[in-house]
């Protein structure tokens, strides 16, 4: 007998307005209240506030709600610095005073470590810099608006594919922010504006970089308009006609300097978004490693050599491991350009066993790792097996740092120092650093 598929009925959501007391922030900086002992996550609400909410999602274990209005405001609330804050998906903590953001993030880091059973340790002072004008990179979305026949130019709305039109962003470095208005005007004047994908702006130490993704070739007039714009403003121009093709059209090769080392990059490469915090982060990592001239250091997830190259100036040998082949080539080139012959880079998938790798038999005295948000679960057993004296773990996700810390501690290491770096002010994200010693 044939059976017909019957889709489950979509669970209905109680849309009545409800008054709640917000008790704390979650790990993504949404306010948490409790209704019938079940947590309700409320974007934009702060602890000690009373709020009128409306459910937008109700699950068995939790609910999500929209903030309708506040009947009692926290003394720690402030007016957002950006006119687009309520709509733009970039920042989600501008309504909380910056000093309180630091406290909340520090608490989040400590709580996650404690939840994983990691014992308390020496907590370093948070590393801070400017809370505004800090982002040296921005990806600007472009969509053709059929009603206006103009490009929508800006950032994605919160939980949406729609675009918030932006001409000024207070968290962008001023060198990039100053170009938003004129860039919007230029792109809308191009004949081929319908064929634009997105735009990226990156601030290098030797100038501002403009990357334009386009899906059809520019005509001669459009090419000249782009070139004239960049010449007039001394911008470095890259065009990307395909996702894996990058053409350097105008200007110098971009680089940034850290600890007197020049690190060259392309606008497709990952670099830390906050230059000032990155400088402090590298300096702190090198200090925590307590380096000497005889050390042999392994740098995992090394990228372009952000840590490897400064390390090479202070120790006997550095080996950098990176999963992306193009990044490895660029790191090797950076070492050569900086005349550092005691650092070697290899490409390897760090989620796979590395016993057969040529570098795995080296006796490393110290290890540094700086993985992506997914963490380094696949490599932690290897780190422990190599038995370094010291491990410094740099993390952009405290949840995976807490998880991975357990693996080292189980193998005889002790967490001796932990610190937060305010890499992403006005967002729920945080950078952290942990020191493990045998």
Curated annotation (Swiss-Prot):
Residues 10-69 form the TRAM domain. Keywords: 4Fe-4S, Iron, Iron-sulfur, Metal-binding, Methyltransferase, rRNA processing, S-adenosyl-L-methionine, Transferase. Its EC number is 2.1.1.190. SUPFAM superfamilies: Nucleic acid-binding proteins (SSF50249), S-adenosyl-L-methionine-dependent methyltransferases (SSF53335). [4Fe-4S] cluster binds at residues 82, 88, 91, 169. The keyword S-adenosyl-L-methionine applies. InterPro entries: 23S_rRNA_MeTrfase_RlmD, MeTrfase_TrmA_AS, MeTrfase_TrmA_CS, NA-bd_OB-fold, SAM-dependent_MTases_sf, TRAM_dom, U5_MeTrfase_fam. One of its GO terms (molecular function) is RNA binding. Catalyzes the formation of 5-methyl-uridine at position 1939 (m5U1939) in 23S rRNA. HAMAP family: 23SrRNA_methyltr_RlmD. This is 23S rRNA (uracil(1939)-C(5))-methyltransferase RlmD. The lineage of its organism: Bacteria, Pseudomonadati, Pseudomonadota, Gammaproteobacteria, Vibrionales.
